[in-house]
């Protein structure tokens, strides 16, 4: 498959519920979407889940955009890619920047699956129709609100619940 074009989209999404961690409260989520287009008109999609500032890891939205635009995308444009496994070798000269690499790789995997007429799950070797996921809860105002949120998520079927804490907020 030949990758004809890569389009980057910067998306600012308002969160349904503010999410509070020890870094602060997040009302919006800024992230990147990567669209990989083949020479046959098929599009594959990937997501870059950076944060706006490098508070959690060194990679952030603007650095990922730069890494994609200046370094990674030129490696795949107008290139014939037989299988997405080839990408790791292409990306190896660049250290770290794993979220940017993963976003482009995800778009190419999606494009590959669509080109092959298969599900992405089957191309990746998946054997299940469903995947169990967990949920992450932000810091609540008090322990009662936290317990209420945990109960609600448990009733919704989540079996793994991650709880955020911070000094002086985790004592009760």
What positions do the PLM features span?
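N-terminal capping/lid subdomain adjacent to the active-site entrance of alpha/beta enzymes
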Residues: 1-172
């Amino acid at each position: 498959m030949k990758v004809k074009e890569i389009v980057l989209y910067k998306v600012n999404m308002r969160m349904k519920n503010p999410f509070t961690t020890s870094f602060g409260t997040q009302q919006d989520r800024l992230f990147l979407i990567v669209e990989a287009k083949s020479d046959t008109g098929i599009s594959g999609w990937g997501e870059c889940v950076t944060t706006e500032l490098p508070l959690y890891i060194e990679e952030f939205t603007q650095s990922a955009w730069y890494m994609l635009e200046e370094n990674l995308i030129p490696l795949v444009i107008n290139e014939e890619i037989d299988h997405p496994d080839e990408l790791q070798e292409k990306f190896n000269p660049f250290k770290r920047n794993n979220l940017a690499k993963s976003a482009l790789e995800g778009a190419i995997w999606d494009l590959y699956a669509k080109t092959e007429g298969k599900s992405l799950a089957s191309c990746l070797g998946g054997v299940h129709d469903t995947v169990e996921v967990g949920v992450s809860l932000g810091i609540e105002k008090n322990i009662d609100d936290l317990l209420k949120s945990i109960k609600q998520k448990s009733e919704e079927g989540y079996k793994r619940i991650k709880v955020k804490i911070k000094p002086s907020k985790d004592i009760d």
